């Protein structure tokens, strides 16, 4: 996994928590779940390099590769399934004061289906938060959540704020799991008001190293789109996602925060910029087209993902900048272009020609309008 390039995000310097005691109380012992996944692994490596942190404990149910273990540096790896009560012993014996829960998965494991995934996600979170509640040393819990909790609907607001409810709450898949997990995290905050619970709703992530449903969907030579729809996409560069998690871990700012890049990209623009060929199909036919793409290894689209590809989703990130004090380095368009470059996608249609035609069209429209 290549993580070269700009390190993700930066503090804005105008956070309202900068003068508070929370900003001065850095974590001493941090436990990171999902440490063998992209975000958990790289976050562990970053935190292990921070001299302000005394100890980092990386937890996952599978053993890390030699390369990942080397990248974790001085962090201690503990092989544990967070669904097992053993996680409480790890937290208690390690005198952990900060827990970063980054283990929730959006795709089903090879063995088992949707039911297994839900158990991994929801039951794992329940057991972990119960362990945090019982551990007097725990003072911070950071939850990696997702913008998918808002769903996607043709009647959605232009921007989702953290206080906006979904018009039609997701009823299945990773989005439903994330809604449930957030609920358990808020329950922990009510039962232990001395714990600062931070929930980060990450926009759809993309980048050269991270494998996501969206990156696989856009990697095929032909990209099916819903006829008559052009989704508005707000993205988040993989390095900015890491930066936001790191910022939340160090800042200890309680609350729920939308995390996304500035600007949007339309689905049609994304397809053109990557040199793919769009294939408009009726919404009802997307399932059949996806079955063919699945056979050629590109992706699998569930109901919530189909809604996202039809309508998109954009969040208001004012609270992220002003209260969390974090600002992503990559805009949505820059994040997408970095994904295209980093993946080495061979254009079916030269994007430079497409952009040239777009520029000429804009110039012509301006001349006609003047």
Describe every region a protein language model picked out.
Residues 27-50:
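N-terminal Rossmann NAD(P)H-binding glycine-rich loop of SDR-like oxidoreductase domains
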Residues 76-123, 134, 152:
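NAD(P)H-binding glycine-rich loop region in Rossmannoid oxidoreductase-like domains
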Residues 110, 165-171, 215-240:
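A conserved pocket-lining segment of Rossmann-fold NAD(P)-dependent short-chain dehydrogenase/reductase
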Residues 126-174:
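Conserved Rossmann-fold NAD(P)-dependent oxidoreductase catalytic core, especially the SDR/UDP-sugar
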Residues 149-150, 173, 195-216:
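Flexible, glycine-rich beta-alpha linker
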Residues 170-198:
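Active-site Tyr-X1-5-Lys
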Residues 177-180, 210-213, 226-250, 255:
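Substrate-positioning beta->alpha
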Residues 242-304, 317, 336-337, 346-360, ...:
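Mid/C-terminal beta-alpha module of Rossmann-like enzyme folds, strongest
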């Amino acid at each position: 996994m290549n993580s070269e390039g700009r390190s993700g995000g930066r503090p804005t310097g105008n956070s309202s928590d900068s003068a508070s005691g929370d900003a001065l109380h850095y974590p001493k012992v941090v436990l990171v779940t999902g440490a063998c996944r992209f975000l958990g692994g790289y976050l562990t490596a970053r935190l292990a390099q921070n001299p302000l942190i005394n100890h980092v404990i990386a937890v996952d149910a599978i053993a890390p590769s030699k390369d990942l273990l080397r990248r974790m540096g001085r962090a201690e790896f503990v092989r544990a399934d967070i669904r097992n009560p053993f996680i409480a012993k790890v937290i208690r014996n390690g005198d952990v004061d900060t827990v970063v829960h980054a283990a929730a998965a959006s795709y089903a494991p090879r063995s088992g289906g949707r039911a297994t995934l839900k158990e991994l996600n929801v039951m794992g979170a329940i057991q972990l938060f119960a362990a945090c509640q019982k551990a007097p040393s725990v003072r911070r819990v950071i939850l990696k959540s997702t913008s998918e909790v808002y769903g996607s609907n043709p009647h959605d607001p232009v921007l989702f704020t953290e206080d906006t409810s979904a018009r039609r709450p997701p009823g299945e898949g990773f989005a439903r799991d994330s809604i449930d997990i957030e609920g358990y995290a808020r329950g922990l905050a009510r039962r232990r008001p001395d714990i600062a619970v931070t929930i980060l709703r990450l926009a759809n992530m993309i980048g050269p190293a991270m494998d996501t449903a969206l990156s696989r969907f856009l990697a095929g030579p032909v990209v099916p789109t819903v006829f008559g729809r052009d989704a508005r996409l707000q993205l988040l560069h993989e390095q900015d996602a890491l930066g936001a998690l790191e910022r939340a871990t160090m800042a200890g700012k309680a609350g729920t925060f939308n995390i996304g890049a500035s600007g949007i990209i339309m689905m049609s623009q994304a397809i053109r910029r990557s040199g793919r060929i769009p294939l408009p199909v009726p919404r009802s036919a997307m399932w059949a087209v996806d079955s063919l793409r699945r056979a050629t290894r590109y992706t699998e689209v569930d109901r919530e993902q189909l809604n996202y590809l039809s309508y998109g989703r954009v969040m208001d990130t004012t609270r992220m900048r002003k209260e969390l004090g974090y600002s992503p380095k990559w805009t949505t368009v820059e994040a997408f272009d970095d994904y295209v470059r980093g993946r080495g996608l061979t254009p079916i249609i030269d994007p430079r020609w497409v952009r040239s035609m777009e520029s000429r069209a804009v110039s012509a429209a301006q001349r006609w309008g003047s």
